[in-house]
């Protein structure tokens, strides 16, 4: 698929999967490069016209295309996730089992802001030999490198959501991708139509743990977390609770659910101490369970 654009102002960039995401704080280093399969590069192009009040919700014309490239470097080599040799081996073995059922279908991670979609997505892509893309980063790149928060402020949420849908549509035409979606991508039925072409996984994190993480990292990059007077944790938790009440049923549309509360119970540890590797393993397990169930239903 090729991207072609022809308007007065054009932005066209080749984006590799390690360039469209922010580097995570932790590192997972694999001793071997297993599942070395063709990666993807995505072209995101857009045309920007001077803003007019009457057309403030106009979409950027995104063109996303992908072509296989033999990229030898691991997308995780620049990160730093702590994982034992046993954890890495377990992830490797489970990924090999799941691949048989996945058959190249894309995996979409959904969930509230701050739930770990990007971090887990990068590890998941590495284990499966997939390419990883973050919808928010693709949109930011397409509109000239401004942040999601700035897009919300300058163009409004509707403008952002329209382009989010366009990105999901383009990605849904591809294969062997792990996609991290925005927290609000689930509210539009058309987005589910695109994501259901692959496998969707809901990362379900207790709101208290989310609020703690987000307030620690800061809320400036979160456009839907309005600055309010009072304790930052309390106001963040209140806003997250409101968002969850609105989106909860939408998240439940996912093919599989990964509950960090359940992981914590099984491993007898606090939710906040669950590692990205442990979450990724549970994602693989839940994907496998879903696909096995789906296969058995088809056979019947």
From Swiss-Prot:
Cofactor: how and how many bound: Binds 1 Mg(2+) ion per subunit.
Presence of the UniProt keyword Plastid in the record: yes
GO BP annotations listed: amino acid biosynthetic process; aromatic amino acid family biosynthetic process; chorismate biosynthetic process
Catalytic activity: shikimate + ATP = 3-phosphoshikimate + ADP + H(+)
Pathway: Metabolic intermediate biosynthesis; chorismate biosynthesis; chorismate from D-erythrose 4-phosphate and phosphoenolpyruvate: step 5/7
Keywords: Amino-acid biosynthesis, Aromatic amino acid biosynthesis, ATP-binding, Chloroplast, Kinase, Magnesium, Metal-binding, Nucleotide-binding, Plastid, Transferase, Transit peptide
Organelle transit peptide residues: 1-65
Cofactor dependence: Mg(2+)
MF terms (GO), sorted A to Z: ATP binding; metal ion binding; shikimate kinase activity
Residues reported in the UniProt entry to bind Mg(2+): 118
UniProt family annotation: Belongs to the shikimate kinase family.
Function (record text): Catalyzes the specific phosphorylation of the 3-hydroxyl group of shikimic acid using ATP as a cosubstrate.
Protein name according to UniProt: Shikimate kinase, chloroplastic
Originating species: Solanum lycopersicum
Lineage of source species: Eukaryota, Viridiplantae, Streptophyta, Embryophyta, Tracheophyta
Gene: SK
């Amino acid at each position: 698929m090729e991207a072609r654009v022809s308007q007065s102002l054009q932005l066209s960039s080749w984006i590799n999967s390690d360039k469209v995401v922010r580097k995570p704080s932790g590192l997972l280093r694999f001793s071997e490069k297993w599942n070395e399969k063709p990666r993807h590069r995505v072209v995101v192009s857009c045309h920007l016209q001077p803003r007019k009040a009457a057309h403030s919700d106009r979409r950027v014309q995104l063109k996303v295309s992908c072509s296989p490239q033999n990229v030898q470097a691991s997308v995780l080599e620049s990160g730093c996730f702590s994982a034992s040799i046993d954890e890495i081996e377990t992830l490797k073995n489970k990924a090999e089992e799941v691949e048989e059922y996945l058959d190249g279908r894309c995996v979409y991670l959904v969930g509230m802001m701050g739930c770990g979609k990007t971090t887990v997505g990068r590890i998941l892509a590495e284990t499966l030999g997939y390419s990883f893309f973050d919808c928010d980063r693709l949109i930011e790149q397409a509109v000239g490198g401004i942040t999601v928060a700035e897009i919300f402020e300058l163009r409004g949420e509707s403008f952002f959501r329209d382009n989010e849908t366009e990105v999901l549509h383009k990605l849904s035409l591809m294969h062997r991708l792990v996609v991290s979606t925005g927290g609000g991508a689930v509210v539009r039925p058309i987005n589910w139509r695109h994501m259901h072409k692959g496998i969707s996984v809901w990362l379900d994190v207790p709101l208290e743990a989310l609020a703690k993480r987000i307030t620690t990292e800061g809320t400036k990059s979160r456009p839907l977390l309005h600055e309010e007077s009072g304790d930052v944790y309390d106001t963040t938790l209140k806003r997250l609770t409101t968002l969850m009440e609105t989106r909860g049923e939408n998240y439940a549309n996912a093919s599989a659910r990964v509950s960090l509360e359940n992981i914590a119970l099984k491993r007898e540890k606090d939710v906040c101490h669950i590692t990205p590797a442990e979450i990724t393993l549970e994602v693989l397990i839940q994907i496998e369970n879903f696909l096995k169930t789906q296969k058995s239903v088809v056979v019947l």
